[in-house]
Amino acid sequence: MKIRVLLLFCLISFQITAAQTLSPTAEISVLTIGQGGSLNDAFGHNGFRINDKAQDIDIVFDYGRFPFNEPGFYLNFARGKLSYSIGVDSFKDVNNFYVWQNRTIKEQVLNLEQAEKQALYNFLLNNYKPENRDYLYDFFYDNCATRIRDVANTALGDEITFNTPLDYKPQTFRTLIHNNLNKNSWGSLGIDIALGSVI
């Protein structure tokens, strides 16, 4: 009886591991979501899409889950200090949600070797475990956009090349915030006060 249970356990473990192996045709891309209408989504959003038709996988990992109903949410958001976590959803649900919100979705497929795709996917799966999900959000240095860069660098050993756009012009954090909050002057004022000299 013990041998059968052990064999069954090994078989189940193998199937879970096998199901997590990406096929050679799998693609990993970065999704960039345009601005939303409220303060907490005024700066857009980012996520990793894992699309593997051969394995019937089409999911999005993102680092933008937060406790919206937490007391003092907007004050903590304006201060740039909240507990955030990684989440995962089907691409279909993510796409439908942002289309419903009338927000743009841009996709950039990453030029990765098979081993790099698997390493990045494995990192995301491990990061999604309950004990690894949460992180302390920082308005400028640790958010859904910086996590894309940091996760890619960590999972792939700093082998990704980031190209600076030709039209890049250095700007202060304050200028960048104001560019995104012109329609919400109270939000802009609140962030200015909460962050003060940091920006």
Which residues does each predicted region cover?
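Bacterial Sec-dependent N-terminal signal peptides
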Residues: 1-21
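Generic structural hydrophobic/aromatic packing signal, biased to beta-strands
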Residues: 30, 48-50, 61, 108-112, ...
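Activation targets extended, charge/polar-rich intrinsically disordered C-terminal tails
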Residues: 126-199
